[in-house]
Amino acid sequence: AEGDVGRVYDGRGEIEERQLSLDDVPATSTKVMVNLANPDAALDWWRLPTDGIGLARMEFVVGEHIKAHPMALAHPDRLVDPDARRQVAELTRHYDSPAEYFVDRLASGIATLAAPWADRPVILRMSDFKTNEYAGLLGGAQFEPAEENPMLGWRGASRYYHPGYRDGFALECRAVRRVRERIGFPNVT
C-alpha cells in the first residue's frame, strides 16, 4: 500500500537484509528524543536509546482518558444540557468533584508518559485542541465558539488566560504540579 491510495503489485518484492553494527556510531551533540501522546505508547517505546521525550502532548489523555471538556468539569453547574450534566456526574462519581476527576486522570496519564524517562527530560505541551475538537468532548459544545477555521482560531496560549478557559487551564496546571511534586516526576517541564 502507498499513501492515501493503495497499490497492489503482483508477485513478491525483493527484500535486501543487512546487519549493521551501531558500535562505531559516534555520539552526537544533538539530543534524540521521542514525541508521544498516548501514555500506553510510553510503555512500548521506553527501551529506545533516547534522551527523553521531546514533546508529550496532553490532548490524547484528555480526549481518551478524561473524555470531558475541562470547563464542564471545572463548572458542571453551568452545563445546560441535562444529558451532559448526567453523564459528567456518572463519569466523575468516584471522585470528590468533577475538577478532581480531571486533575487526577490527567496527572495519571502524564505520569505514565513520564515514568519510563524518569531520569531524562519530558517536555510537556499543555492542551492545544482546536475549538471543534474541544466541542466534541462531553459538555464541550456549550463552551466553544463556532469557528470558520479552527486551525487558526482560539487555541494554545491565547486560550489559557482567556476568561472562557482560564479555569480549565488552572486544572491542567494543578495536574502538572501533582505530577512534579506529589507523584515525583520533576523531569516533566
Stretches with model-predicted labels:
Residues 1-2:
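Conformationally flexible catalytic loops at phosphate/diphosphate-handling active centers
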Residues 12-13:
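Beta-strand/loop-dominated core regions that host nucleotide or nucleotide-derived cofactor-binding catalytic loops
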Residues 18-189:
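Conserved alpha/beta-domain cores
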Residues 5-7:
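Nucleic-acid-contacting surfaces of polymerase cores and analogous helical-repeat interfaces
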